[in-house]
Amino acid sequence: MKKHLLFLGPPGAGKGTQAAYLSEANSYLHLSTGELLRKEIDLDTYLGKQVKDIMNKGELVSDQLVLEIVNKNLSKDNKGWILDGYPRNLSQVNSLNEVLMNINQPLEIVFYLDVPDEVLIKRLLLRGRKDDNEETIKTRLKIYKETTEPLIEYYKNLSLLEYINADGDLKTISNDIKQKMA
C-alpha cells in the first residue's frame, strides 16, 4: 500500500475530508496547509495576522512560509503522510521534491479530486468558514486554475496522477481512493 500521498483539487473538492479519513484509518500524518495556517490565525500570532490578511483577500500564502511549515512536519516520525493543499504551483513542487529527496520519502501517488465549479461554490458556501464568501471563492478558483492546474499535467507525466470523481458521496469517493492506493 502506498504511504506517501498528495491530494490535489480545487477548494471545496473534499481534499481535507478524504485526507483526514485516510490518515485516521492508516495512522498517517495528515498535513493540511490550510489547517496549519488557520491554527496560526487562531493563535493570533504575528504570523497568523499576516496569514489572515492574505487569506481574507483570497490570495495564496508565500511559498517559503508554507514550505517551512511542511518541512518541519514531514521530518517528524511517521508511518506515512498525506499532503493536502500543498504544493500549489510548480515552484512549490520543485521545493517539495528537494525536501522529499533529503528525507528519503518520495511521493508515491497523487490523487486529483475533480468537481464541477458550481458544486464547489455551493459546498464552500455551505461549510461557513469566515474566509468563504462568494467573491473570495471565485477569486480562489481563478487563482487555482492559473497556478495549481498545471500540476495535474506535471504529475500525469510522472505517472503519479490518479483521477478521482469527487462529485459524489463520501463513501464512494473513499472506496475509489483506497482501491487506487493498493
Curated annotation (Swiss-Prot):
Asked if the record carries the keyword Isomerase, the reply is no
Q: Which domain of life is it from?
A: Bacteria
What is the documented function of this protein? Catalyzes the reversible transfer of the terminal phosphate group between ATP and AMP. Plays an important role in cellular energy homeostasis and in adenine nucleotide metabolism.
Cellular component GO terms held in the UniProt record:
cytoplasm
- Species of the source: Prochlorococcus marinus (strain MIT 9515)
- Protein name (Swiss-Prot/TrEMBL): Adenylate kinase
**Name of the encoding gene:** adk
Q: Name one GO molecular function term.
A: adenylate kinase activity
What residue spans carry the region label NMP?
32-61
> Which transformation does this protein catalyse, written as a reaction?
AMP + ATP = 2 ADP
GO biological process, alphabetically ordered: AMP salvage
